Structure formats: structure tokens, C-alpha cells
Curated annotation (Swiss-Prot):
InterPro entries: Ribosomal_uL15 (IPR030878), Ribosomal_uL15/eL18 (IPR021131), Ribosomal_uL15/eL18_sf (IPR036227), Ribosomal_uL15_bac-type (IPR005749), Ribosomal_uL15_CS (IPR001196)
Listed GO biological process terms: translation
Native source organism of the sequence: Borrelia garinii subsp. bavariensis (strain ATCC BAA-2496 / DSM 23469 / PBi)
Quaternary assembly: Part of the 50S ribosomal subunit.
MF (Gene Ontology): rRNA binding; structural constituent of ribosome
Entries under Pfam families matching the protein: Ribosomal_L27A
Signal peptide: none
Superkingdom of source: Bacteria
Entry protein name: Large ribosomal subunit protein uL15
Native organism taxonomy: Bacteria, Pseudomonadati, Spirochaetota, Spirochaetia, Spirochaetales
Length: 145
């Protein structure tokens, strides 16, 4: 265990530059002769040498409404069936306790994937039509919060 060897090429030696002509990387340190790339810094990304760059030549277009987009945490009826008992209330807190959702989003949407065999009362933000009909057919209740 303690005398294992690294595979060949696993650790590469650091390039030591500017230490004389015998090293192979002396004098100009592998940077060639004069010019911008031989100096200390290179221009930032998108810089086109003083020419007006592409991102400024093209017009701005469109808008984004993502700041106001409503996102729902999706929970399937099959998961509810596995984690909840008959007659239990399914809401944000109980879903959090049963680790079916994470803390970040309080808006919950129920979808009809999986089988539901238990009467549960749902207190959620949204529910699909197929899931709603399944819950009502079994005898559960739905309250939109």
C-alpha cells in the first residue's frame, strides 16, 4: 500500500524559464521575440485591438422575463403514496419532513405519475387535471393554497 508508484506521466515537472540557454527555455522564455505576446499581459477576451468589437457593433435585441418566472417544485402521486399514510395531510411542511422537496421553493405542483392508493388531503399551489381526478376518485381532498 505504501510503496505504490505513480503511473508514468501522472506528475509533470514545473516549467522553469529564463535560466540560461542550456535549459532550452532561457532568454525569451519560450515567448519568441518582441511583440504583445512577449510582454507581461495579454488583452482581455473580446478585445479586437482597438477596433469596435463585435458585441458593440451588433444591436441589443429582446428581453428576459426570468426574474418574474414562477417555478414550481414537482411532486408525483407515486412518491406521495410511498411516503404518506392514509388520511394524512400533504402540504409544504409534511413534504419537507418526508424529504420529497427541498427548502428553497414553497410553490408545489402535483403530477399524476405513479399510483395513489391512499386517501390524502392535499394543500398545494397547483395540481394537474389527471392527478386531481385520481385524488378525488379515491376520496381525497384538494385545497389550493
Amino acid at each position: 500500500m505504501f510503496n505504490l508508484l505513480k503511473p508514468k506521466g501522472a506528475s509533470k515537472r514545473r516549467k522553469i524559464v529564463g535560466r540560461g540557454p542550456g535549459s532550452g527555455l532561457g532568454k525569451t522564455s519560450g515567448r519568441g521575440q518582441k511583440g504583445q505576446k512577449a510582454r507581461n499581459t495579454s488583452p482581455r477576451l473580446g478585445f479586437e485591438g482597438g477596433q469596435t468589437p463585435l458585441y458593440r457593433r451588433l444591436p441589443r435585441k429582446g428581453f428576459s422575463n426570468n426574474d418574474y418566472k414562477l417555478e414550481y417544485t414537482i411532486v408525483n402521486l407515486g412518491d406521495i403514496d410511498k411516503k404518506f399514510k392514509d388520511g394524512q395531510v400533504v402540504n409544504y411542511d409534511t413534504l419537507l419532513e418526508n424529504k420529497l422537496i427541498r427548502k428553497k421553493n414553497k410553490k408545489i405542483k402535483i403530477l399524476s405519475n405513479g399510483e395513489l392508493t391512499k386517501k390524502v388531503s392535499l394543500e398545494v399551489s397547483k395540481i394537474s387535471k389527471s392527478a386531481e381526478s385520481l385524488v378525488i376518485r379515491i376520496g381525497g381532498t384538494i385545497k389550493l393554497v
